[in-house]
Amino acid sequence: MAALQYNCDAGLAKAPTFHPSLWGDFFLTYQPPTAPQHVYMKERAELLKEEVREIVKGTNELPKLLDLIITLQRLGLDNHYEIEIDEHLHFIYNSSCDVKDLNLVSLRFYLLRKNGYDVSSDVFLNFKDKDGNFASDDIRSLLSLYNAAYLRTHGEEVLDEAIIFTRRHLEAALTSLESKLADEVSLSLQTPLFRRVRILETRNYIPIYEMEPSRNEAMLEFAKLNFNLLQILYCEELKTVTAWWKQLNIETDLSFIRDRIVEMHFWMAGACSEPKYSLSRVILTKMTAFITILDDIIDTHSTTEEGKLLAKAIDRCSQDANEVLPDYMKHFYMFLLKTFDSCEDELGPNKRYRVFYLKELLKILVRGYSQEIEWRDEHYVPETIDKHLEISRVTVGAFQLACSSFVGMGDIITKEVLDWLLTYPELLKCFTTFVRLSNDITSTKREQTGGHHASTVQCYMMEHSTTMHDACEKIKGLIEDSWKDMMQLYLTPTEQSKVVAQTVVDFARTGDYMYKKTDAFTFSHTIKDMIALLYVEPILF
């Protein structure tokens, strides 16, 4: 079968110049609050947690219940009340709802689908007039409908139409709204509520909630303390992984890679934000570091032969393989093996077996990289975007990170779950397709100036003889299809714990955030302010 041709230099990628770290050793000098301060914060938070629990238990009216649970989720407090919220969700699912109240119906639909209940979207047909338009001009109701509609699956035309209708009306009304509602509408038009990274939403929402006349003071204080305690934990983790990163001697041995250890932790914290996932975040950050280094070596720096040698060494995971590597790779490779050993110690005797999966994930990654090296050197473009994705959805690294997140989790993740994840189930295929397409839209122009293999964008352009603009527009549609695919699988009952699907969706949210406007990981100045809010600036009382 004849290969399509794409012009790039064979044998050696042209290394780009990445901007240096924006944070340097900043977090190495992090000083946590004094022990008495920390103890006070935790004790006060425990008291407030129980006070809020009484509020959660005592709320029974449907409108108040919907508002309460959504507020708890946005404040980052819902994980403290999982049992109570599950009971309330069961009640909400089995309760009748005023089918004439668009806001109420939308909030109920949003909350139930967000928590895995496969409720029908036909309920929204009740709000369409004889012309097929939604019969409402209330902005709050339209905003709720807009956010609810993004939990759509394939074939739900009423939700597709709802997004078009509400977006048009919300955009038209934006300039005439009072500032608080205008800000909320503007934010939703940029990123619908369901797709926001949860911990970043919490950091942004707490100051907004503080301005609400109807706010609950106990919930507000608990939310602030809860976030600030989490921020302390994040900074301690970041101090640990920064010290680990320094041992790689990036400045001398790997000066050409993206020096982004802070951004790596930031990304992983977005996917696994809760305190109980501390070990998972640390392991994930280290895996992200290895994936970044491998990507930058093989994709943009090494010769073809050097890249293949490194891929073979990763596949062996043996100290002997280090002997044939170029000098600049040797320390990195041995450090990789040393980190695998330390991960076994961190996981403990009952979970050390899980490091096998980290190794297997990197082996899968470099096999894909080897295929892409051949594409680059042979000037090859796969004939269809589907054939491209067979390889490129694996090499984007999202599969490796999503699976790695479960290695550091508790007993709820069994060996059977990890084995199942390695089979590359459909949910992970949909997720990694989404990340690959999102990545390619933002990075293709930059990468094609550096002798990179053809991306899915170039593949689509050549397959359909179209322009880059048209290809990107089409791929945006495929990205929306990937969200629908993920949502359908998210709502489909499986033998796996619901934490698996929830975590994959959380990773999708981080991918949407990092690739929404640019490649924010590579050009990390675009997220520096948000990183400061998450790590450096506590929420004031």
From Swiss-Prot:
- List locations, semicolon-separated: Cytoplasm
Outcome of substituting V435S: Production of mainly beta-sesquiphellandrene and beta-bisabolene. Production of beta-sesquiphellandrene and increased production of (E)-alpha-bergamotene and (E)-beta-farnesene
The residues forming a coiled coil are none
What does the entry comment about cofactor binding? Answer: Binds 3 Mg(2+) or Mn(2+) ions per subunit.
| UniProt-reported outcome of changing L401V | Changed product specificity and production of mainly beta-sesquiphellandrene. Production of beta-sesquiphellandrene and increased production of (E)-alpha-bergamotene and (E)-beta-farnesene
List the Gene Ontology MF annotations in alphabetical order: alpha-zingiberene synthase activity; magnesium ion binding; terpene synthase activity
UniProt main location, coarse:
cytoplasm
Q: What is known of its domains?
A: The Asp-Asp-Xaa-Xaa-Asp/Glu (DDXXD/E) motif is important for the catalytic activity, presumably through binding to Mg(2+).
List the pathway annotation. Secondary metabolite biosynthesis; terpenoid biosynthesis
Q: What is this protein called?
A: Zingiberene synthase
Name the family.
Answer: Belongs to the terpene synthase family.
Which segment of this protein is annotated as the motif DDXXD motif? 295-299
Up-regulation conditions: Up-regulated by herbivory.
List the GO cellular component terms: cytoplasm
Function (record text): Sesquiterpene synthase converting farnesyl diphosphate into two major products, zingiberene > beta-sesquiphellandrene, and five minor products, 7-epi-sesquithujene, sesquisabinene A, (E)-alpha-bergamotene, (E)-beta-farnesene and beta-bisabolene. Can also accept geranyl diphosphate as substrate, producing nine monoterpenes, with myrcene, limonene and alpha-terpinolene as the major products.
The UniProt annotation places Mg(2+) 1 binding at D295, D299
Q: Which organism is it from?
A: Sorghum bicolor (Sorghum)
Top-level EC class, please?
A: lyase
Gene behind the chain: TPS1
Instruction: Tell me the residue numbers annotated for binding Mg(2+) 2.
Output: D295, D299
Reactions this protein catalyses: (2E,6E)-farnesyl diphosphate = alpha-zingiberene + diphosphate
| EC code | 4.2.3.65
